[in-house]
Amino acid sequence: MARTKRTPKPKRSLFEPSELQIHIAVVQHLKMRARRGVIFFHPASGEKREKATAAKLKAMGTTPGVPDLILIADGKTYGLELKTIDGRLSHEQRQMLEAFELAGAFTAVAHGLDAALSILTAWGILPSSSANTLKSNAVTSGPAYAIP
């Protein structure tokens, strides 16, 4: 039986941040700049796990495709999916974003850090002023959610 040769995935440019780097930068901005009363968190649903752990989490309600960040502000729920500049949504992510919208939540897909910050500003989560911009080398610690 002949094996099909797979074409390698194109390598990311050294100057293009990974999805993880974008995610961490967005969370840093939220920790430092989110309006008072905004709650945000990352539902850990997309990581690779051992089969036993995955089965336990699935039984507990972990669902594939949930947006990278869930935000709650002023009685509204937001789901933000983060992608690299050329990143694509999976089938499960498309379905979940549609389900969020049908349930009344606001959703968006951000391709890159600038897009994510623009969306969060448009939603009123981050202030529109650029006076509080985060320095690129800043590191924050603490929980991945904000408590008013």
Range-by-range predicted roles:
Residues 1-148:
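Catalytic phosphate/metal-binding cores of nucleic-acid and nucleotide-processing enzymes, i.e., regions
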